[in-house]
């Protein structure tokens, strides 16, 4: 590399080298953590103080975003956090997935952790877990106890029932509630309903027979016979 001699500010000669400009442009990342160097391009970073290690994922909790990898050389369990995974979107590891990484001491002093985790080839993306947790904001269908429909609204703000009175959410009637709704009973317990209806019909028929003229005459005839028998018994005594 050539060196140029130029006149300095005080009239003296100064030695200039293009390497001087390069050294001025490179950021000083000595003593910075991994998170603090995330904004610095990878080609400007200093080489890692540790060699690249290889291992496989032991387990990974996709809901909490952390897990452990087993190092191939030592068999040691190394903590791994989702923020240190080289992948886009939802970051996770699949059980048994092959990975490469660097090792450093954890900031809380509880063992070692793997960082800059990628595929077996450094910089290669990870496959990730096949399991994704449900989003907290995902719409959940609930049973509205006013209109009876499965929807995202609750009974208090039901848009389908305009009245303030209690209604049956099975058939929509205002005359009864769902617990005694005949439609619900017929739908969910057909055998029991059929037995109850048969018993009710039998009782109604007995009541009708008791009130019919034929039944009254039959009862009157039995009373007459009973009185005659009682009279004959008294006369015989």
Curated annotation (Swiss-Prot):
Q: Which SMART domains match?
A: CSP, ZnF_C2HC
Summarize where Zn(2+) 1 binds, as residue positions.
144, 147, 153, 158
Look up the domain of life of the source.
Eukaryota
Coiled-coil blocks: none
GO CC terms: cytoplasm; nucleus
Which InterPro entries does this one have? CSD, CSP_DNA-bd, Lin-28_RNA-binding, NA-bd_OB-fold, Znf_CCHC, Znf_CCHC_sf
Q: Where are the zinc fingers (CCHC-type)?
A: 143-160, 166-183
Question: What are the UniProt keywords, alphabetically?
Answer: Cytoplasm, Developmental protein, Metal-binding, Repeat, Zinc, Zinc-finger
A molecular function annotated in GO for this UniProt entry is: pre-miRNA binding
Where exactly are the transmembrane stretches of this chain? none
Question: Does the keyword Zinc-finger feature in the UniProt annotation?
Answer: yes
Basic and acidic residues: which segments have biased composition? 17-26, 204-237
* Record keyword Metal-binding present: yes
* Compartments in which it is found: Cytoplasm
- Known function: Heterochronic protein which controls the choice of stage specific cell fates. Regulates the timing of the second larval stage events (L2 events) in the hypodermis. May negatively regulate the larval to adult transition via the suppression of the microRNA (miRNA) let-7 during L3. Through this regulatory role, controls the timing of the sexual maturation of the nervous system. Plays a role in governing the developmental timing of male tail tip morphogenesis. Plays a role in the control of seam cell number and vulval development.
Q: What is this protein called?
A: Protein lin-28
Which organism was this protein described from? Caenorhabditis briggsae
Gene behind the chain: lin-28
């Amino acid at each position: 590399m050539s060196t140029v001699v130029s006149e300095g500010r005080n009239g003296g000669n100064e030695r200039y080298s293009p390497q001087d400009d390069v050294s001025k442009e490179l950021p000083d990342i000595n003593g910075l953590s991994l998170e603090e160097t995330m904004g610095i391009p990878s080609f400007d970073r200093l080489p890692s103080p540790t060699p690249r290690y290889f291992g496989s994922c032991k387990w990974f909790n996709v809901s909490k975003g952390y897990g452990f990898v087993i190092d191939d050389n030592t068999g040691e369990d190394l903590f791994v956090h989702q923020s240190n995974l080289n992948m886009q979107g939802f970051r996770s590891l699949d059980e048994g997935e092959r990975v490469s990484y660097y090792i450093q001491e954890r900031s809380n002093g509880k063992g070692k952790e793997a960082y800059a985790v990628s595929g077996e080839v450094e910089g290669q993306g990870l496959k990730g877990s096949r399991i994704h947790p449900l989003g907290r904001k995902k719409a959940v269908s609930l049973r509205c106890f006013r209109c009876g429909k499965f929807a995202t609204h609750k009974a208090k703000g039901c848009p389908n029932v305009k009245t303030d009175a209690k209604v049956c959410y099975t058939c929509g009637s205002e005359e009864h509630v769902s617990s005694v709704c005949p439609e619900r009973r017929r739908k969910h317990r057909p055998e029991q309903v059929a037995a109850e209806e048969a018993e009710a019909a039998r009782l109604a028929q007995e009541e009708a027979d008791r009130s019919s003229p034929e039944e009254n005459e039959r009862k009157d005839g039995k009373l007459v016979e009973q009185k005659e028998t009682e009279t004959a018994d008294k006369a015989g005594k």
